[in-house]
Amino acid sequence: MSRPTIIINDLDAERIDILLEQPAYAGLPIADALNAELDRAQMCSPEEMPHDVVTMNSRVKFRNLSDGEVRVRTLVYPAKMTDSNTQLSVMAPVGAALLGLRVGDSIHWELPGGVATHLEVLELEYQPEAAGDYLL
């Protein structure tokens, strides 16, 4: 099954690479999935990031097309995760799936246990790059 093109900024990619090298994450299946996403991603500088792309620290509204549920979450690094009702770790399967997608994109993504989900990005309520916050 083909996946939509994803765009990741160089700073996010570097930080995720460092995260994935940590022993706590290196052996996890999600680490392999994130590495594969980084390998296929188009890279750009934070300043060149299109304003409709889900980046780290973006607040994204998305729909689970499997059950129709709509959620709004801020995509964060695990160390910044404080509230699962408002945040989503990039090391969570859904967080990894959303990274780099554009508004309007949808993706099929495998969850733990072999279950698949189908997600659609509806809106970016905040993107650091669009706000000029290039170092978040």
UniProtKB/Swiss-Prot annotation:
Gene3D superfamilies: 1.10.286.20, Transcription elongation factor, GreA/GreB, C-terminal domain. GO terms for molecular function: DNA binding; RNA polymerase binding. InterPro entries: GreA/GreB_C_sf, Rnk, Rnk_N, Tscrpt_elong_fac_GreA/B_C, Tscrpt_elong_fac_GreA/B_fam. It comes from the Bacteria. Disruption phenotype: Mutant shows a significant reduction in the level of Ndk. Pfam families: GreA_GreB, Rnk_N. One of its GO terms (biological process) is regulation of DNA-templated transcription elongation. Can restore alginate synthesis and Ndk activity in the aglQ mutant of P.aeruginosa. Contains a short N-terminal coiled-coil domain and a C-terminal globular domain. Interacts with the RNA polymerase. Belongs to the Rnk family. May act as an anti-Gre factor. Regulates the level of the nucleoside diphosphate kinase Ndk. This is Regulator of nucleoside diphosphate kinase. It comes from Escherichia coli (strain K12). The gene is rnk.
